[in-house]
Amino acid sequence: MTVSIDGVSKYFLKQTGTVQVLENINFQLEEGDFVTVIGPSGCGKSTLLKIVAGLDNDFEGEVVIDGEPILKTSKKQGFIFQEHRLFPWLTVEENIAADLSLKDKYVKDKVREWVEIVRLDGFEKSYPKEISGGMSQRVAIARALLRDPNVLLLDEPFGALDAFTRSHLQEVLLNIWEQKKTTMIFVTHDIDEAIYLSNRIIIMSAKPGKIHKVIENNLPYPRNKTSQSFQQLRTKVLQQFEYGGLIQTSI
């Protein structure tokens, strides 16, 4: 399974004229890759994810998953937003199943499997208002992975959470990745998060958004954020922002 992003450019039409958001984005992912995308605000990271997800088909270039051009959403792509976007009138297990029927034994068994993987045992019948924000994001992760997508796209899914919950969900996500080897593209503003999670870090520059640098991350798992090797890689990434002219409002 491969994901190929070839020559992707994106323009928005505004009252003041045409604005280019992405310029000639090219990269490939092999099965089981975990890639993080990081860059200044406004560099088009989220726009790129929406294109790969098939949520935006008004672009130049091509996105191909398993040899098939992507122009619409499909079961090949799972998407997790910063907000969990759960249906408040559905229980945890019903949200995970989404439009699939829990009366189907296969669906019921799959939902039960994912409830266990994301550690929500005992909360299957709970409603979103009865669980925490971190638990709600675990439901969103399970929902996105229930259909076994070829690639999971994550748009700053832990950005609004407190540090302790974010750290816990990073571990949950890594455990899932190690078990399932789902290919992942994860957008973040957090350099430590990018280094901790992925095996490749794509650094983007802004206006228009383009790939500034790709850094291979060969640190062994599990990773220690206080280790010398982690800090050395962190310095290497930071230098791209400091000396590459990428720092604007935030990283």
Swiss-Prot record:
It comes from the Bacteria. Residues 3-231 form the ABC transporter domain. ATP binds at G39, P40, S41, G42, C43, G44, K45, S46. Its EC number is 7.6.2.14. It is an enzyme of class 7 (translocase). Belongs to the ABC transporter superfamily. Aliphatic sulfonates importer (TC 3.A.1.17.2) family. This is Aliphatic sulfonates import ATP-binding protein SsuB. The lineage of its organism: Bacteria, Bacillati, Bacillota, Bacilli, Bacillales.
